Amino acid sequence: NKAHYALAGLEKQGKLKAVITQNIDGLHQAAGSKSVYELHGTIMKNYCTRCGREYPLSTIIESKGIPRCQVKDETGGVCNGIIKPKVVLYEEGLDDNVVSGAIKHIRNADMLIIGGTSLTVYPAAGLIRYFSGRHIVLINKAPTSSDSMADMIIREPIGETLEAIVCE
């Protein structure tokens, strides 16, 4: 949507260092963003729960029924493990490398733009506490528990708002 393309445009202009998202759909990369931290994983990458082999999304889409790993094991048999998306389900831990990368970017930012989130899902909502830069801009239609931390609050759709910023 417009927000994904606007963020990619800001990155291309050198004004955005990273996108930190809870979305698992891969749309930030599809829009052109390069530095994306997917806190809850992605459906674009999939893996065998038994042997760990990685598979593209097409394997899931083209599968009839539950996708199974067809890799031959050391005995010549087929692995047959279930192939599932690399996503974080409720009560599962987040990837430490993704979280530490996100924290690094938040700590080093002079401005933090938070958009399209109610800031209620933890631990992602708690990442705001790592920001020590100058300005927080919050773009969300409804109030959040972090509104008091924001220097600017915009209660408009995020796509149109970011698109207007990129065009100026």
Where does each model-flagged region fall?
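Conserved catalytic alpha/beta core of Sir2/sirtuin-type deacylases, generalized to analogous enzyme cores
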Residues: 1-168
